[in-house]
Amino acid sequence: MSELLSFALFLASVLIYAWKAGRNTWWFAATLTVLGLFVVLNITLFASDYFTGDGINDAVLYTLTNSLTGAGVSKYILPGIGIVLGLTAVFGALGWILRRRRHHPHHFGYSLLALLLALGSVDASPAFRQITELVKSQSRDGDPDFAAYYKEPSKTIPDPKLNLVYIYGESLERTYFDNEAFPDLTPELGALKNEGLDFSHTQQLPGTDYTIAGMVASQCGIPLFAPFEGNASASVSSFFPQNICLGDILKNSGYQNYFVQGANLRFAGKDVFLKSHGFDHLYGSEELKSVVADPHYRNDWGFYDDTVLDEAWKKFEELSRSGQRFSLFTLTVDTHHPDGFISRTCNRKKYDFDGKPNQSFSAVSCSQENIATFINKIKASPWFKDTVIVVSSDHLAMNNTAWKYLNKQDRNNLFFVIRGDKPQQKTLAVKRNTMDNGATVLDILGGDNYLGLGRSSLSGQSMSEIFLNIKEKTLAWKPDIIRLWKFPKEMKEFTIDQQKNMIAFSGSHFRLPLLLRVSDKRVEPLPESEYSAPLRFQLADFAPRDNFVWVDSCYKMAQLWAPELALSTDWCVSQGQLGGQQIVQHVDKTTWKSKTAFKDTVIDMARYKGNVDTLKIVDNDIRYKADSFIFNVAGAPEEVKQFSGISRPESWGRWSNAQLGDEVKIEYKHPLPKKFDLVITAKAYGNNASRPIPVRVGNEEQTLVLGNEVTTTTLHFDNPTDADTLVIVPPEPVSTNEGNILGHSPRKLGIGMVEIKVVEREG
């Protein structure tokens, strides 16, 4: 209803101003600004829905306002371009319509009415309401009843007898199991669900709507609210350090806790969270690559579900035979948005909907088959009688190719339990949420029936039952939950440990690199993660007088304040204010100590603008003083005009990437010397090794041969045509995820470049 009202007010404002208001520059600008805000808000809502499926939620506050750099971002480039072009077209059309009768005399009354209607359209829009609620949740002091509902359980289970297998299905919400809506989509796992305790109304709350947040909610009974963006949790050294979570209780009760997944454990700080709460045995893509049958059988995120669940079964067998009490948690990935992935061993590789194949539904049908196969192996084993199997979604599906069909249904998360010791078949329609999962499992294992804000759905009353406005209540508790991190409020001294790549201050430890906004009563960490913008782009959003401490590679801040460090990959510390003074210090000791030093100086807005503009220069446009192209730092030497076909800097150098161009091209500002030596320090990837690699300057071509290890080769060129471009053509670029950013599409690697130097020859 509010959508229709806001749109009607918007339309009325446009029509009244266009046909009645007449000519007046101020009223035109004011009305266009407010109407433009309405458009931006609704496009933001549309974009947020595209990524989250839940409008402008807590994750969007960080993810969309920082950057979409991260998992699977290439698949969102076209929608992003479409939004920008659409926004430009709408603004142009809006301005043209409002100025249709600009030659008519100005009418104050109609202008005022049009502006008021425009303001009303903004106020009535769902996007404005969602953003307002999010902003309120950031500024609240908390809710006085939090302490009454947050309950810490006993740290042990009195007499544990059952082992636990807990399966997180990536985005595998219960909605997929509606056989009337999606016939024969989940027959294998659906049949198992119907054999156990099936909790049919598990709702999703704020702070539980992405993977690490869903894991925290289900194991600790609290949403993931933090003094930083949740997916940046990989930068912290401990995770809710004061809280008692399910893993802690299991470990204290004699369980060995295991976690197995196909993706990198560092993503979003899963390794930090699990190690902080009782898990001593973790297996991700790095740990599994030496033990899986085919280490090259991977998708954009890591190993496929069939591989991961095969390894989980081996671990279940091994642990069961040992007689040691254990818990085994695993997380699938094949159903990750936007399209999902199909394991090669499943029979259900294709699912048609609305008369055509649907990739997301196909991935769901395949993944549920793999999960069911794993569960049936456990059920057929002699150890099932001592085992509790839990299957849950980590969160509701985000915007995938099945999303519009899911939204037509009543959506809930998946949570069901199969007990080997006490088979029970029942569907429980009690209102509950993800935070109740851990408490329910703890209750089944013989422990307490509460865990944080979670309550057992077998013997307790969920917060979802107690509070009709549970989503608003959860946001009201946000400041209380953030305080559970025990995060420091001041930063006076700090220590950098180069061996551990950590910074420590006021009792807290963070992985590097890190940006901190420091005020009198608050220290706000801004880590760098797969989902966030690079730290220099985040710093560019600071106000002129905001105090900052920025710890990063020296070359990243050198172009601003320390050009002598432009080629250094060591750690440097910069601190100050963008509109005031800044200092850069080179970290030159293994354990390096310093103090914050913020001077209260006059703010120079010209300096501020210059700093912001420099911080926002994209990597490929950065230039530094050097007599060679150094590939392990961003940018290029001043002599280079532009380059293409080259991937991002890594610690050793950069790969060529045929996804960005079939050839490596380096165009110089001026013609290359008439006679010169080209000194190339590089290596080859895969089948490119030991093969001739053409290197061209103008009409002259030389051949480069590289191995898999870095070597230096000198090629001799004559350049009679004054060519200014160097071209290198890898013979067989290989599609691979090796060294790739998690979730990105595979790169096509050819040669790895460390340094290229042009040396003029006499004569």
UniProtKB/Swiss-Prot annotation:
Gene Ontology BP term (one): glucan biosynthetic process
Compartments in which it is found: Cell inner membrane
Main location (coarse class): membrane
Keywords, in A-Z order: Cell inner membrane, Cell membrane, Membrane, Transferase, Transmembrane, Transmembrane helix
Molecular-function GO terms, alphabetical: phosphatidylglycerol-membrane-oligosaccharide glycerophosphotransferase activity
Cystine residue pairs: none
Domain of life: Bacteria
Topology of this chain in the membrane: Multi-pass membrane protein
Record field: transmembrane: 4-19, 26-48, 76-98, 105-127
EC top class named in words: transferase
Coiled-coil stretches noted in the UniProt entry, renumbered to this chain: none
Catalyzed reaction equations: a phosphatidylglycerol + a membrane-derived-oligosaccharide D-glucose = a 1,2-diacyl-sn-glycerol + a membrane-derived-oligosaccharide 6-(glycerophospho)-D-glucose
E.C. number: 2.7.8.20
Presence of the UniProt keyword Membrane in the record: yes
Gene Ontology CC annotation, any one: plasma membrane
Pathway named in the protein's UniProt entry: Glycan metabolism; osmoregulated periplasmic glucan (OPG) biosynthesis
InterPro entries, per the entry: Alkaline_phosphatase_core_sf, DUF7024, OpgB, OpgB/LTA_synthase_biosynth, Sulfatase_N
Job description of the protein: Transfers a phosphoglycerol residue from phosphatidylglycerol to the membrane-bound nascent glucan backbones.
Family per record: Belongs to the OpgB family.
Protein name: Phosphoglycerol transferase I
